[in-house]
Amino acid sequence: MSTVVTIPRSVSWKGDAIAVLKQTKLPHSTEYKTLTTIEEVWKSIVMLEVRGAPAIGIVAAFGLALASKKYTTLHIEEFQKKFNRDCNYLGTSRPTAVNLFWAIDRMRESIQEITTIKEAQKILEEEALRIQQEDEAVCRSIGEHALTCFKDGDNILTICNAGSIATARYGTALAPFYIGKEKGVRLHAYACETRPVLQGGRLTTWELKQAGIDVTLITDNTAAHAIQTKEINAIIVGADRIVANGDTANKIGTMNLAILAKYFDIPFYVAAPLSTFDITKQTGAEIVIEERDETEVTKIFGKQVAPVGTTVYNPAFDVTPNKLITGIITEKGIICGDYKREIASLFEKTS
């Protein structure tokens, strides 16, 4: 028996503007913001109004399509110059999320051979829509594959928000919860609150409750105790960048969970599309880790909680070594074991 599941969306194309779900306002209010310039798109990404690697790539693609419609030049060479400038500009918004650069490169390549501005504008809009549509199909496929790792009644721990609002639809790490709901397979999510921005507490709990999926919120430092006492069967997380050997960059605190999974002998899965892989980098040591503003740590909802002037280290991501990962779940299936060989083989088959 199948069930219709309500799944919120984060990015919508309006033809002359982009509507984005302001994730910074959740769960208190559901507000959509209209973006009409490339600068507004950049700021929306930086301010985490749009977040999640696939969603960032989608909004960047739409942002470039939008910007191209505003160029006043009549010459294709000048058009390309302005477009490349905007591509480079958007690339400075979130350096760790590889989907951002994947989407930018795909948009750039789509008009390499185009000779008229009107045709270029048309192709850019079509390509951005295609990126969004493909991501929805990819996320559903990830969910189908991930669901084979779990059984009815499983308790599954996750961190941050790798759900529908971080992608076109369904999400990556949360996709099996949605697909399971559709198919009558009950999965119970345990969501780490995810300091300092609380994506787990604000976003994962919100979207799963919207869909009627069981979710229990825990503080980040409860994870070990929860695994020990709540019969956690597995851990599943998303990814912002996976390199050639399987080392994975994801929200800060992810490696903590991988170490706990190893200690308690439960599976630790990474769920991500092929667009999140960066096979130009051989190990996680090559990944640039974004460091964010100290006020994310020293203030909570605008209120100072640490002495003024306190030194803060606030990396947005950490890198989980491949040896701690049970399997990487992609739209093409689940890879495990010799990640360097399996990832290379996967990309050979898709090239």
From Swiss-Prot:
Which positions bind substrate?
51-53, 94, 199, 250-251
Q: What is its EC number?
A: 5.3.1.23
Q: Which SUPFAM superfamilies match?
A: NagB/RpiA/CoA transferase-like
The terms under GO molecular function for this entry are:
S-methyl-5-thioribose-1-phosphate isomerase activity
Q: Which reaction does it catalyse?
A: 5-(methylsulfanyl)-alpha-D-ribose 1-phosphate = 5-(methylsulfanyl)-D-ribulose 1-phosphate
Which processes are annotated in GO (biological process)?
L-methionine salvage from methylthioadenosine
What the record says about family reads: Belongs to the EIF-2B alpha/beta/delta subunits family. MtnA subfamily.
Biological role stated in the UniProt entry = Catalyzes the interconversion of methylthioribose-1-phosphate (MTR-1-P) into methylthioribulose-1-phosphate (MTRu-1-P).
User: What's the protein here called?
Assistant: Methylthioribose-1-phosphate isomerase
